[in-house]
Amino acid sequence: ADAQSHGKLGLALLTDGVMPRGWHEYEWRWKCANYRPMPVLPVPLWDGGPLQGSLLLHAEQGFGDTIQFCRYAPFLARRGRPVVLECQPELLRLFARIEGIEVVPRGAATPPVVAHCPLMSVPARLGTTLDTIPSDVPYLAPDPKDARRWANRLDALGDRPRVGLVWAGNPNRINDHTRSLELSALGTLIERHDVAWISLQTGGPALQAARYAGRLHDWTGE
């Protein structure tokens, strides 16, 4: 069978809410030549069954996917499975406040575990449907001190609508050209004075914000 076709079918089914079949078709991504290989670990891949020990969930794609699917870590922990979540180092500070689990940055030593599972494979293991997607929101919370500090900073911008901008994703992603753009493409919008524009961009593309200093608030270095 054509693994790429199955993977794309999985995405199409998930877009239409056809679950759990969509999740199972999406598992074919691991057999696609252009997809990263499954991590080789000294413990077995979790099959969705009971465990006598901790389960390692590891992020496999970008920040957005990890943020969306990390909800499954506390979901499993509340059902009696000790969970260790391995995430991108940039997300460690945010995820550290998830209750009931242990969080480690990618590349660091992990506590003892008896099985592992890619984070985006958990729904397939659980047979997730639209009705059973963990929906306890919010499932992420910032540090209260940070929240107060940034609330004060944003309030100082006045009563104008406040709009955060991210114009580029990870440039190493194979289809990045379909989703990223140059900030100059938004120049006409940024010149509007009835909106407070705030850069939320990270990485190399964040340097483009300097061109709009005074119109685009850039606090990403703080």
Language model segments and positions:
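Alpha-helical solenoid repeat scaffolds of the TPR/TPR-like class and their adjacent stem/linker regions
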Residues: 1-222
